[in-house]
């Protein structure tokens, strides 16, 4: 997942305004106590950041593939 795909997925799932707040301010334990933005800046793979953000916000598994990306086979 590219950063641009991550941003689209965040906007699609959470809405543009709320999504920006989440990635900038929500500290996620699964990301080492970092925000999504800080984790990406630290080199954490973007797909891993997306999955952690989804888990932290209770996004159902079937919606975690991200906008424009195929859902994983079950």
Predicted regions and their residues:
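C-terminal alpha-helical interaction appendages
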Residues: 1-74
């Amino acid at each position: 997942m590219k950063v641009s795909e991550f941003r689209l997925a965040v906007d699609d799932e959470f809405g543009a305004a709320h999504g920006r707040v989440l990635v900038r301010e929500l500290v996620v334990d699964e990301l080492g106590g970092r925000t999504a933005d800080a984790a990406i800046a630290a080199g954490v793979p973007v797909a891993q950041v997306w999955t952690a953000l989804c888990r932290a916000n209770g996004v159902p598994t079937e919606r975690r593939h991200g906008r424009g990306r195929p859902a994983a086979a079950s």
